[in-house]
C-alpha cells in the first residue's frame, strides 16, 4: 500500500542515488577524492533565485564531470532527471529564517535549500566522510551496501519467522471456518499478523530501493515470501467486515490498519473496533461466520466476478459448503462444469484444513 507523498519522493530519490547508478558512482568518486560537495537535484526559477555567481554549463551528466566540478568551491545544480549538469561553482543563498538543526555551513545550506526549493539536496562531508540526503523535510545518511545488506538480512529473517507464524494462524482459521467455530479473536489475529508481515516487508522494500543493483537477490526473496499476502489481507477483511459497519469499505479498513500505531496493532480489542466490531470486553469471544471469500479464492480458475456472485447469493461459507451442484448452478455465470469444480474444490479444502489441524 502506498505511503504518504513524502515517502514516495524519498524513495524515488533513494532509487536515483542507489549503488549502480551513475550519480552514486559520482558521489563515491567525490568521497574517495577526500573532497566535499553540495549538489541540488533539480532546477527551476526558485533554485535559480537562490544561486549567485558560478557559471552555467548545461552539459550531459557523467560521474567524472561531477567529481571534477566538486573540486571547485560552490554548489552544483543538476536537472530534475539528473541527466544534465546545469550550473557549477554557484553560491547558494537560502532564506536564513528557514529553520535548520544542522551546525556545519554546508549542511545548514543543504537543509535550507531542500526546504525552500522543495528539491532533494546532497551534502558530501569531507571531514566526516559521509553523504547526507535532504529531502521531503528529512535528513538521511546514505550507507554503503554492506551495512544496508546487514540490516536487510536481519529484517528478512524476521519476516520469515512472522510469515511462518502467519501461515499457522491462517491455517487454524481455515479449519475453524469449516467447523463454523470462528470467533472475533481468531479472525482478528490473522489480520494482525498480515499487517505485521506487511510492515516488515515495507521496510525491506526500502532497503531494496536503497541497494539499487545490489538488492536484486533480496528483492526476489521478498517477492517469494510475500506472494499472496496482500490478497489475503483484503479477503480476510471482506470475509469478516460486519454488515452495515461504520468502519467503511474494505479499502478504508485496510487504510486504517496501515495507519495504526505499533502499540494499537498489538491490542486485539482496538484492532477489532477498527475492523468494525463493537461491544464490551467480551467482543473477542463473540462467534462470527465468514462470507467465504478466502476459501473461494483457493478454488483453482475461479474468476473474481464469480466469487462475488457466489458470496452475494449464499451469504456465508457454511451455506456455500452445504450447497449442492444444482444450488451452485442457480448462480449467474456458474454452469454445471464450474459448479462441480467449486463443489469438489471446497470439499478438498475442507478435508485438507481439518487434516492439517488435527493430524
Curated annotation (Swiss-Prot):
The keyword Signal does not apply. It catalyses: 2 ATP = 3',3'-c-di-AMP + 2 diphosphate. Its EC number is 2.7.7.85. One of its GO terms (molecular function) is adenylate cyclase activity. Residues 7-146 form the DAC domain. InterPro entries: DisA, DisA_sf, DNA_integrity_DisA_N_sf, DNA_integrity_scan_DisA_link, DNA_integrity_scan_DisA_N, DNA_integrity_scanning_protein, RuvA_2-like. Pfam families: DAC, DisA-linker. It comes from the Bacteria. GO terms for biological process: DNA repair. It is an enzyme of class 2 (transferase). ATP binds at residues 74, 92, 105-109. Keywords: ATP-binding, DNA damage, DNA repair, DNA-binding, Magnesium, Nucleotide-binding, Nucleotidyltransferase, Transferase. Participates in a DNA-damage check-point that is active prior to asymmetric division when DNA is damaged. DisA forms globular foci that rapidly scan along the chromosomes during sporulation, searching for lesions. When a lesion is present, DisA pauses at the lesion site. This triggers a cellular response that culminates in a temporary block in sporulation initiation. Also has diadenylate cyclase activity, catalyzing the condensation of 2 ATP molecules into cyclic di-AMP (c-di-AMP). c-di-AMP acts as a signaling molecule that couples DNA integrity with progression of sporulation. The rise in c-di-AMP level generated by DisA while scanning the chromosome, operates as a positive signal that advances sporulation; upon encountering a lesion, the DisA focus arrests at the damaged site and halts c-di-AMP synthesis. Homooctamer. HAMAP family: DisA (MF_01438). This is DNA integrity scanning protein DisA.
Amino acid at each position: 500500500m502506498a505511503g504518504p507523498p513524502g515517502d514516495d519522493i524519498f524513495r524515488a530519490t533513494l532509487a536515483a542515488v542507489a549503488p549502480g547508478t551513475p550519480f552514486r558512482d559520482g558521489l563515491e568518486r567525490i568521497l574517495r577524492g577526500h573532497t566535499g560537495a553540495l549538489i541540488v537535484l533539480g532546477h527551476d526559477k526558485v533554485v535559480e533565485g537562490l544561486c549567485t555567481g558560478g557559471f552555467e554549463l548545461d552539459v550531459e551528466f557523467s560521474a567524472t564531470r561531477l567529481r571534477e566540478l566538486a573540486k571547485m568551491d560552490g554548489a552544483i545544480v543538476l536537472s530534475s532527471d539528473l541527466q544534465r549538469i546545469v550550473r557549477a561553482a554557484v553560491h547558494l543563498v537560502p532564506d536564513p529564517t528557514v529553520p535548520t538543526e544542522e551546525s556545519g555551513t554546508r549542511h545548514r545550506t543543504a537543509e535550507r535549500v531542500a526546504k525552500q526549493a522543495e528539491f532533494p539536496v546532497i551534502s558530501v562531508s569531507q571531514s566526516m566522510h559521509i553523504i547526507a540526503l535532504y529531502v521531503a523535510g528529512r535528513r538521511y545518511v546514505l550507507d554503503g551496501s554492506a551495512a544496508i545488506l546487514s540490516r536487510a538480512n536481519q529484517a528478512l529473517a524476521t519476516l520469515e519467522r512472522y510469515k511462518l507464524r502467519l501461515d499457522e494462524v491462517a491455517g487454524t482459521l481455515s479449519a475453524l471456518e469449516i467447523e463454523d467455530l470462528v470467533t472475533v479473536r481468531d479472525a482478528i489475529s490473522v489480520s494482525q499478523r498480515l499487517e505485521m508481515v506487511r510492515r516488515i516487508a515495507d521496510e525491506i522494500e526500502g532497503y531494496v530501493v536503497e541497494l539499487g543493483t545490489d538488492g536484486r537477490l533480496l528483492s526476489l526473496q521478498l517477492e517469494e515470501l510475500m506472494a499472496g499476502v496482500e490478497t489475503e489481507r483484503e479477503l480476510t477483511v471482506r470475509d469478516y467486515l460486519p454488515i452495515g459497519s461504520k468502519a467503511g469499505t474494505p479499502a478504508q479498513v485496510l487504510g486504517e490498519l496501515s495507519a495504526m500505531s505499533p502499540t494499537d496493532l498489538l491490542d486485539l480489542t482496538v484492532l477489532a473496533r477498527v475492523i468494525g466490531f463493537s461491544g464490551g470486553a467480551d467482543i473477542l469471544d463473540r462467534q462470527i461466520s465468514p462470507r467465504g471469500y478466502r476459501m473461494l479464492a483457493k478454488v483453482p480458475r475461479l474468476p473474481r466476478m464469480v466469487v462475488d456472485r457466489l458470496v452475494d447469493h449464499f451469504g456465508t461459507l457454511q451455506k456455500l459448503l452445504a450447497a449442492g451442484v444444482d444450488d451452485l448452478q442457480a448462480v449467474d455465470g456458474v454452469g454445471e462444469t464450474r459448479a462441480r469444480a467449486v463443489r469438489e474444490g471446497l470439499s478438498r479444502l475442507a478435508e485438507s484444513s481439518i487434516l492439517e489441524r488435527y493430524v
